[in-house]
């Protein structure tokens, strides 16, 4: 499988990295090989209503007039409890979006950790998806009675061939809605794959593995992946591609900022490319009116109030580093770090309302400080900012956006992070011995808003 640069229009400046080559790349098949089908994959949509209509329009354009079989693959986290409009409306826009997908092409959803944000019982979520004509896959089990919430594998007719689709979720229970955690039994991804993947893929023609386990879990699945399979990852809000023999592994971005197209060829090769979803593009008429009406109905004056203005749009990574720098300034320390999924999307240009800002900084919390040596701080910085090109082996899954200033020969350095990252320091900092103390009267959202925007 060769790797070639994408055309400029495919370049996704917001978050793009490709593990296999500098810049954003495509894993490409031979241009003269017969196309068997195309998978349009996306994950971690999180009720991103500012781009939902544009994403649907892009999918419509991809499929319109094509005689090639298509499959739409949604790899979890469709809903977002932090979106007040989603909560108040019962996710009416999300459900309408989902309902349009099977009208375009066969659609498969693999359950993520936010898909029961609005409806705690996943059985109800799965039943509603199936009523729309969506196929659901998952390895999550109902801990109350041992029933699976969905089949772990399905075989779908796909043009002249068939496609076996396998689904796996993240076993990080603390990322699921609290009300549902006692109802969920989720195996460790690697252990589950070791025990089940070969059986589930036995006799398969074409193969698609959808994992919402995140990079750390996927790393245990990949060695078990049959050559020539396509694997789509999610959960970490990353955008990258990786080749393994004739297999392709891709993370597709988040917040409806992008989708990934995987083209399967008759010679066994797979071409993978990423397309940005333009915020300024025309939304699909099938969704545009509903989005406008729903926002007008459910947003309060306070949520429509302008917090400040941004002179330019920032990518997600730029936003993360700007927030980290603002946290460091507010706490009077040398370095700031914020968890990657504390953020949703990049800061837009122009006036930013409270509602729009809440999509940028999803969660509030305390700021926590710790003291480290300059050498340890350098190590944390090397681990941070994984929106850059880097190999799969270097990726940690959960990561931090970080910003630091000079130390001027200091023997110690101080850092600040959120209470979530302090509590989960093993995942984010790669250590368990940092001693944190609270930075009094500082909150994540207040500091971020003041640092990002000029009032």
Language-model features, listed with the residues they occupy:
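Acidic, metal/ion-coordinating pockets
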Residues: 3-6, 10-13, 31-282, 318-320, ...
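Sec-dependent signal peptide hydrophobic core
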Residues: 15-19
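Catalytic centers of hydrolytic enzymes
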Residues: 36, 42, 47, 256-330, ...
């Amino acid at each position: 499988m060769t790797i070639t640069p994408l055309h400029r229009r495919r370049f996704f400046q917001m978050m793009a990295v490709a593990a296999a080559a500098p810049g954003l790349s495509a894993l490409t098949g031979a241009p003269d090989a017969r196309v068997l089908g195309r998978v349009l994959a996306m994950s971690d949509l999180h009720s991103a209503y500012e781009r939902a209509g544009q994403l649907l329009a892009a999918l419509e354009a991809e499929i319109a007039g094509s005689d090639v079989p298509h499959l739409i693959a949604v790899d979890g986290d469709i809903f977002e409890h932090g979106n007040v409009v989603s909560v108040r409306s019962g996710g009416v826009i999300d459900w309408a979006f989902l309902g349009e997908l099977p009208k375009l092409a066969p659609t498969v959803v693999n359950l993520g950790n936010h898909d029961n944000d609005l409806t705690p019982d996943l059985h109800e979520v799965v039943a509603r998806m199936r009523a729309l004509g969506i196929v659901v896959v998952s390895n999550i089990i109902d801990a109350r009675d041992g029933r699976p919430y969905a089949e772990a594998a399905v075989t779908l007719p796909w043009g002249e061939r068939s496609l076996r689709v396998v689904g796996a979720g993240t076993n990080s229970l603390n990322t699921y809605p609290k009300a549902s955690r006692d109802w969920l039994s989720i195996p460790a991804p690697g252990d589950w794959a070791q025990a089940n993947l070969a059986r589930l893929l036995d006799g398969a023609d074409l193969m698609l593995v959808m994992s919402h386990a995140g990079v750390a879990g996927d790393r245990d699945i990949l060695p078990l992946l049959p050559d020539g399979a396509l694997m789509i990852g999610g959960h970490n809000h990353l955008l990258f591609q990786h080749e393994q023999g004739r297999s392709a592994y891709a993370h597709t971005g988040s917040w409806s900022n992008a989708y990934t197209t995987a083209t399967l060829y008759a010679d066994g090769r797979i071409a993978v490319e990423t397309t940005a979803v333009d915020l300024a593009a025309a939304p699909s008429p099938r969704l545009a009116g509903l989005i406008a009406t729903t926002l007008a109905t459910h947003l309060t004056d306070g949520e429509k109030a302008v917090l400040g203005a941004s002179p330019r749009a920032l990518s997600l990574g730029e936003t993360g580093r700007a927030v980290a720098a603002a946290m460091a300034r507010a706490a009077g320390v040398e370095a700031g770090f914020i968890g990657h999924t504390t953020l949703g999307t990049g800061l837009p240009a122009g006036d930013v309302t409270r509602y729009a800002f809440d999509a940028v900084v999803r969660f509030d919390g305390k700021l926590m400080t710790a003291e480290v040596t300059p050498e340890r701080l350098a190590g944390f910085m090397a681990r941070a900012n994984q929106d850059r090109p880097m190999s799969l082996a270097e990726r940690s899954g959960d990561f931090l956006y970080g910003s630091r200033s000079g130390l001027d020969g200091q023997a110690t350095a101080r850092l600040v992070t959120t209470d979530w990252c302090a509590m989960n320091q093993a995942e984010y900092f790669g250590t368990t011995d940092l001693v944190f103390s609270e930075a009094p009267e500082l909150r994540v959202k207040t500091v971020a808003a003041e640092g990002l925007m000029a009032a």
